[in-house]
């Protein structure tokens, strides 16, 4: 079983405190399911980015399976890995969609638990899903250490084909923060350029702007894999629901991390 790695750090360890914090994240937001295929959510501590993430989860539809693409911050494990372990959070147990996972056999995606063991980017999304949908769903966690354009397009296409054949209702979630440790005005300027490419569903444009701006968006690969898969399944538009940065909470606008909530329909 994949035990929580960052409970008590990124979000509360005790279930009652975690539910209280999640409730605060959703405060004032209308819970209204939209026909969403994909989304971008931040993965910082809930005190910093939980409110931004809640903008996505408030409108996320109920699905059989949520495919979660996250960057590999730790460097452990395979370059592209899927976990087939059961995942545990303070709110309970989540099963992996082993049928979809088995479809990845022999592909660029390795079954590998090591890459997931200490990685926070996917884990921090799970209590949001549990808060909204209880335990009535499965996940497919994909951790991307390799984030080059060719790899993520291959992964996104592969997942989309599997989902299409399965007939299941699936939503894709890309876990990513945006610019790291720049003054707020510069971070927003860089992030606006990357977000514009995302809203245009333009994967090559994301990479072009990323290199040109030397941007420190940590989950550009997961975002691009999510966009690739969503487009394969018919997505035609994207929308920015919310943008913020860590300075809004800490008060330090000289070195912020950017957070965006984006949906793809």
Swiss-Prot record:
Gene3D superfamilies membership? LigB-like
InterPro entries named in the record: MEMO1_fam (IPR002737)
Q: Which HAMAP family match?
A: MEMO1
Native species of this protein? Methanosarcina barkeri (strain Fusaro / DSM 804)
Family as reported in the entry's similarity comment:
Belongs to the MEMO1 family.
What's the protein here called? Answer: MEMO1 family protein Mbar_A1422
């Amino acid at each position: 079983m994949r035990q929580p790695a960052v409970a008590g750090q990124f979000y509360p360890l005790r279930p009652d405190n975690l539910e209280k914090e999640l409730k605060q994240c959703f405060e004032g937001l209308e819970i209204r399911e939209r026909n969403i295929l994909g989304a971008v959510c931040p993965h910082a501590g809930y005190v910093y980015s939980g409110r931004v993430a809640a903008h996505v989860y408030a409108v996320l539809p109920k699905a059989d399976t949520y495919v979660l693409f996250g960057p590999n911050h730790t460097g452990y494990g395979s370059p592209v890995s899927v976990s087939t372990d059961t995942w545990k959070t303070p709110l309970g147990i989540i099963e992996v969609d082993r049928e979809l996972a088995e479809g990845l056999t022999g592909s660029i995606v390795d079954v590998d638990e090591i890459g997931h063991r200490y990685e926070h980017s996917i884990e921090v999304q799970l209590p949001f899903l549990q808060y909204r949908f209880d335990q009535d769903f499965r996940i497919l966690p994909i951790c991307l250490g390799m984030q080059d354009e060719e790899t993520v397009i291959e992964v996104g296409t592969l997942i989309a084909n599997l989902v299409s054949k399965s007939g299941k209702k699936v939503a894709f979630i890309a876990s990513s923060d945006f610019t790291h440790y720049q003054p707020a005005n510069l971070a927003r300027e860089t992030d606006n350029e990357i977000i514009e490419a995302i809203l245009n569903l333009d994967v090559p444009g994301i990479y072009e702007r990323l290199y040109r701006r030397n941007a420190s968006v940590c989950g550009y690969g997961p975002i691009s894999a999510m966009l690739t898969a969503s487009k394969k399944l018919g997505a035609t538009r994207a929308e920015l629901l919310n943008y913020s940065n860590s300075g809004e909470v800490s008060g330090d606008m000289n070195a912020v991390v950017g957070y965006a909530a984006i949906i793809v329909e």
